Amino acid sequence: MIALVVGGAKSGKSMFAQNLSKSLNESLKNPISGQLDGEIEREVGKLYYVATMNPYDLEDLKRIENHLREREGYGFNTIEETLNMSKVSSLIKEEDTVLIDSITSLVTNYMFRGKEFYKDVSDDILSGILEIINNSKNVVIVSDYLFSDSIQYDCYTENFRKEIGVVNRKLAKIADTVVECSYGNIIYHKGKVI
């Protein structure tokens, strides 16, 4: 299962994605019936949280602290990786459930590496995420929705928005489910209600 969860800041998207990831992973614990010796348990994968934010200021650190508190008790194994999704892919197995939070942070990290500005980053990001998708049972991906205003931004910001848009569109195309979180409301754009 591939799910893309989008929304604005403080929309509830991360909490929704955490609950969805946990639910998908727990659904793998259902026993397989009809075996000779009764019921047997399926092999259950691990639940991973891929934290992609590279904190730049106090607000980022507070957001990270909040996310850590929110996911206490969920059973996530946290992987902190700000760029290399191929490295993440090498750590997971085909029965695992992976939550990637977030595309927005990945685009930021790729575009502003060191003192350079990298304009075209979507292919590199998608390549790493596709590796994770191909190596795991379930992937839930969080991304921001940054396209509802009508303000013209500088060329760097416009390019940033374009790259997020490219990644979001391509992920939405391959996702089984696409969900938008808005003011705590859940809107399904693709797939079934989970």
Where are these regions (language model features)?
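Generic beta-sheet signal
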Residues: 1-5, 47, 96-106, 139-141
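Residue-level signal for inorganic ion chemistry
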Residues: 17, 67, 99, 144, ...
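Portal/gating segments that form or line small-molecule/metal binding sites
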Residues: 69-92, 97-113, 119-123, 133
